């Protein structure tokens, strides 16, 4: 009986020794780190069997590291590396790279998504503006694209032929790794200044951006068409310099059809949620809520939810607004909880 108990115990120890294991990192940088650990020779010389053990392993939880376990009869070595995200640089990247650091960034989103899946990460770091020149459909299964040491716009539609559809992707405009004094260089998450089409579907989220001027979430001028569906969200975006359109700015004959989704928690001088300048918005559903305007000195703030104006006496950089008719039509949905801190228009403000 005693021999049987000892035999069972040894069998359990052998099975446990051969099991894949996860190594946990106390701290990891955005560009990864490598750590080696040495284990002493096991008590039983034949614990690993003949030929040793060489087995790749990974863990699915956030604190675990991907790596390789190698062992022979003398020792066991664990080499692990933290993969915190894949780096995407359309300007300087190369799809032959591994994408694990900024210096080895890949060039296309398709490759970045492929490597993110292979490495078990849900984060992609955007290191240069991504230009859309044709038709692109981004469905990333809930992954997040972060702004990484990137000033200006994150995504730019180059001309009227450009079309971008977003589904199940979070685009986070918060600067991932940059000194606070450089943060003022950032601008809109999406810029479309020469026409084009933008469609936001379920799971598309634009958030946490701070723009120097207009349209912190989306800047759309000169005939851009935007559609927003159920499950899409534009939230927590801000214009620092008291400009227009915390969530979206429409200008110069652009159109926005809101069939569903939510625009919330955005802030601007005018149009905390949406600013419609010489353009058209039709709201069929969804919610515009908890947006706000700044209280300024010497300059009024207005239209916390939606601001509508035939033209704006404003320009900046390559942005120039032209006098055009503006309209807002509400057929459904809700506008609630917005707050204008100066000239009024908590929900909708029309300015001629």
Describe the predicted segments one by one.
Residues 3-16:
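Sec-dependent N-terminal signal peptides
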Residues 16-25:
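C-terminal segment of classical bacterial N-terminal signal peptides
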Residues 26, 31-42, 46-110:
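Right-handed parallel beta-helix/beta-solenoid
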Residues 86-90, 107-131, 136-141:
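Glycine-rich repeat segments that build the extracellular carbohydrate-interaction surface of secreted
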Residues 115-117, 130-141, 146-168, 172-199, ...:
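Extracellular beta-strand-rich solenoid/capping regions of secreted or surface-exposed proteins
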Residues 121, 148-154, 174-187, 210-216, ...:
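Short glycine/acidic-rich loop motifs that flank beta-strands on beta-rich extracellular proteins
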Residues 140-144, 163-175, 197-210, 225-238, ...:
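Right-handed parallel beta-helix
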Residues 203-204, 215-217, 231-232, 245-247, ...:
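Periodic glycine anchor positions in long extracellular repeat architectures
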């Amino acid at each position: 009986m005693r021999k049987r108990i000892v035999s069972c115990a040894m069998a359990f120890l052998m099975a446990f020794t051969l099991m894949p294991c996860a190594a946990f990192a106390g701290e990891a940088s955005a560009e990864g780190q490598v750590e080696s650990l040495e284990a002493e020779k096991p008590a039983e010389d034949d614990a690993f069997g003949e030929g040793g053990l060489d087995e790749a392993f990974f863990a699915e939880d956030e604190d675990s590291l991907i790596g390789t376990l190698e062992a022979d009869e003398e020792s066991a070595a664990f080499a692990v590396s933290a993969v915190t995200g894949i780096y995407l640089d359309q300007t300087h990247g190369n799809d032959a790279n591994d994408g694990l650091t900024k210096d080895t960034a890949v060039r296309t989103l398709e490759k970045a998504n492929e490597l993110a899946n292979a490495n078990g990460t849900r984060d992609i770091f955007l290191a240069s503006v991504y230009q859309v020149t044709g038709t692109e459909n981004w469905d990333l299964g809930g992954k997040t694209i972060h702004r990484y040491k990137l000033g200006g716009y994150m995504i730019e539609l180059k001309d009227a032929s450009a079309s971008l559809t977003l589904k199940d992707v979070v685009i986070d405009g918060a600067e991932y790794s940059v000194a606070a004094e450089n943060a003022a260089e950032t601008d809109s998450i999406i810029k479309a200044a020469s026409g084009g089409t933008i469609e936001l579907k379920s799971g598309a989220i634009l958030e946490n951006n701070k723009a120097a001027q207009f349209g912190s979430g989306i800047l759309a001028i000169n005939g851009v068409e935007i559609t927003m569906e159920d499950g899409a969200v534009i939230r927590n975006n801000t214009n620092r310099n008291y400009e227009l359109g915390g969530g979206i700015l429409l200008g110069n004959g652009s159109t926005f059809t809101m069939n569903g989704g939510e625009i919330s928690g955005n802030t601007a001088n005018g149009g905390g949620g949406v600013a419609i300048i010489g353009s058209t918005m039709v709201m069929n559903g969804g919610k515009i809520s908890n947006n706000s305007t700044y209280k300024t000195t010497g300059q009024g703030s207005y239209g916390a939810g939606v601001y509508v104006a035939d033209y704006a006496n404003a320009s900046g950089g390559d942005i120039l607004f032209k006098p055009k008719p503006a309209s807002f039509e509400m057929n459904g949905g809700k506008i609630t909880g917005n707050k204008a801190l100066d000239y009024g228009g908590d929900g909708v403000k029309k300015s001629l």
